[in-house]
Amino acid sequence: MTTFLSDSEHPQDVKAPPKSARRRAREFVLQGLYQWRVGGADEASIEAYAPEMEGFAKADREFFVGTLRGVISQQEKLIEQVSTHIDRPFNELSPVEACILMLGSFEMLNHAETPYRVIINEAIELTKAFGGTDGHKYVNGVLDKVAAILRPDEVAARKQAKK
């Protein structure tokens, strides 16, 4: 019998910090975007189904709905933004990485209150949890380039502070 670790269990009995409501919402947004992109689910059915999923009650519902709707409605703009920084056509990316890149780009465009490094870190964590083995490295590199375009002052200030 195979045993799987839950989100709160780790091999050395080291407890991970509890997930924030926004991090949980990002996970559900990613799952919804995957259902939309791969399974052809529509926005309304994703919004109706998500609250039934385990753990959704602890997620930031407002962030979930706004972000899911925003990514879907701005998909062309987000794909265009990401496409200038990738090494292949967008539709050749893994579905998980494509959804995470759209999510990260959406947040950079629409959530100025969230530092770009937080957005990138959240995208990396999502990719580690749901994506391919080294997908997080790719996502990190692409979103760093996106941040330099969408948030040039913030990126420059961070580089200046590191000196």
UniProtKB/Swiss-Prot annotation:
Keywords: RNA-binding, Transcription, Transcription antitermination, Transcription regulation. Involved in transcription antitermination. Required for transcription of ribosomal RNA (rRNA) genes. Binds specifically to the boxA antiterminator sequence of the ribosomal RNA (rrn) operons. The keyword Repressor does not apply. The gene is nusB. The lineage of its organism: Bacteria, Pseudomonadati, Pseudomonadota, Betaproteobacteria, Rhodocyclales. Belongs to the NusB family. GO terms for biological process: DNA-templated transcription termination; transcription antitermination. Residues 1-21 are annotated as: Disordered. GO terms for cellular component: cytosol. PANTHER family: ANTITERMINATION NUSB DOMAIN-CONTAINING PROTEIN (PTHR11078:SF3), N UTILIZATION SUBSTANCE PROTEIN B-RELATED (PTHR11078). InterPro entries: NusB-like_sf, NusB_fam, NusB_RsmB_TIM44. This is Transcription antitermination protein NusB. Coiled coil: none annotated.
